[in-house]
């Protein structure tokens, strides 16, 4: 369980909701793992056709909690082996577990993007099959190079596939935000132009229910499996490449230094 993430089932919907708007829905590593566990739970429920990611407040999620990341660097490490083992356990394993849960998910993944999403949270948005935006103030930011490491949780695949290689190069290399005008038609399929997040969340569910009328449920899931098959294989392959690529950066200590600067207000994202 998490105080920042909850879930409930509503007919064909398994709804996962971020519920800490006071802290811009920032998440710990345990929260990301919990979301992955909920995806597995949704997979096992026959009546569920859609897994829906919702949020609350003005931000979808500001990404990982600075304090949670910096906590991983606490304590003395006596050897290089101990340091790497600790990082594999605390960072590499959760990243692989979360990315794999999204890659192999059988239900249609829908994201109700109510506001900006940053870091690993933005990576989850990019992994969804269908993304709806509340209004045109949303953006995605993948500040990995600004934080001292490289692409994680499938972004080396999702962004190149959905935004195109040149745009992905620019945003990933320079850690610049992907604004609404570029997201619409690539990652976002529809903009609801609403101001209230709860109204937006409910409207998306109503529209999906209406669109489901007359459809054969097994065809819905079969279509997801067919359309996602190529992406699924690419994501599974990317997990090893991304994890092995980013681990040396974490081992160098640079990301911890930069997260601490963010926490102390001495570093900012390019918003």
Curated annotation (Swiss-Prot):
Induction cue: By oleate, through the binding of the OAF1-PIP2 transcriptional activator complex to its promoter ORE element. Expression is also induced during ammonia pulses in yeast colonies, at the beginning of detectable ammonia production.
Motif Peroxisome targeting signal (PTS1) per record, residues: 269-271
Active-site residues, Swiss-Prot/TrEMBL: 152
EC numbers, comma separated: 5.3.3.21
One cellular component term from this protein's GO annotations in UniProt: peroxisomal matrix
Keywords of the record: Fatty acid metabolism, Isomerase, Lipid metabolism, Peroxisome
Database matches in InterPro entries: ClpP/crotonase-like_dom_sf, ECH/Chromodomain_protein, Enoyl-CoA_hydra/iso
Subcellular location: Peroxisome
GO molecular function, one term: delta(3,5)-delta(2,4)-dienoyl-CoA isomerase activity
Pathway: Lipid metabolism; fatty acid beta-oxidation
Reaction equations catalysed: a (3E,5Z)-dienoyl-CoA = a (2E,4E)-(5,6-saturated)-dienoyl-CoA
One annotated GO biological process: fatty acid beta-oxidation
Binding-site positions, substrate: 62-66, 120
Quaternary structure, from the entry: Interacts with ECI1.
Family membership: Belongs to the enoyl-CoA hydratase/isomerase family.
Annotated function: Peroxisomal di-isomerase that is involved in fatty acid metabolism enzyme by converting 3,5-dienoyl-CoAs to the corresponding 2,4-dienoyl-CoAs. Required for ECI1 to be located to the peroxisome.
Protein name: Delta(3,5)-Delta(2,4)-dienoyl-CoA isomerase
Lineage: Eukaryota, Fungi, Dikarya, Ascomycota, Saccharomycotina
Gene for this chain: DCI1
């Amino acid at each position: 369980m998490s105080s920042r993430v909850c879930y409930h089932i509503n007919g064909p919907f398994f709804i996962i909701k971020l519920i800490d708007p006071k802290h811009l829905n920032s998440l710990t590593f345990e929260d990301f793992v919990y979301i992955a566990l909920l995806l597995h739970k949704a997979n096992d429920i026959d009546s569920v056709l859609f897994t829906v990611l919702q949020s609350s407040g003005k931000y979808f999620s500001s990404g990982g909690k600075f304090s949670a990341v910096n906590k991983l660097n606490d304590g003395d490490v006596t050897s290089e082996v101990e340091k790497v083992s600790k990082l594999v356990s605390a960072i590499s394993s959760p990243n692989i577990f979360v990315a794999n849960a999204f890659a192999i998910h059988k239900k249609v993944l829908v994201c109700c993007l109510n506001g900006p999403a940053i870091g690993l949270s933005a990576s989850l948005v990019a992994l969804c099959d269908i993304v709806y935006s509340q209004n045109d103030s949303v953006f995605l930011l993948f500040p990995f190079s600004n934080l001292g490491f490289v692409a994680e949780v499938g972004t080396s695949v999702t962004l190149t596939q959905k935004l195109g290689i040149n745009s992905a190069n620019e945003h990933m290399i320079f850690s610049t935000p992907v604004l609404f005008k570029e997201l619409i038609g690539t990652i976002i399929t529809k903009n609801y132009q609403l101001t209230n997040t709860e109204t937006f969340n409910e409207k998306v569910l109503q529209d999906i229910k209406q669109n489901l009328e007359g459809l054969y449920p097994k065809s819905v899931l079969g279509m997801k499996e067919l359309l996602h098959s190529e992406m699924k294989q690419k994501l599974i392959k990317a997990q090893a490449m991304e994890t092995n690529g980013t681990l040396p950066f974490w081992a160098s200590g640079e990301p911890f230094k930069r997260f601490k600067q963010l926490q102390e207000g001495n570093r900012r994202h390019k918003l």
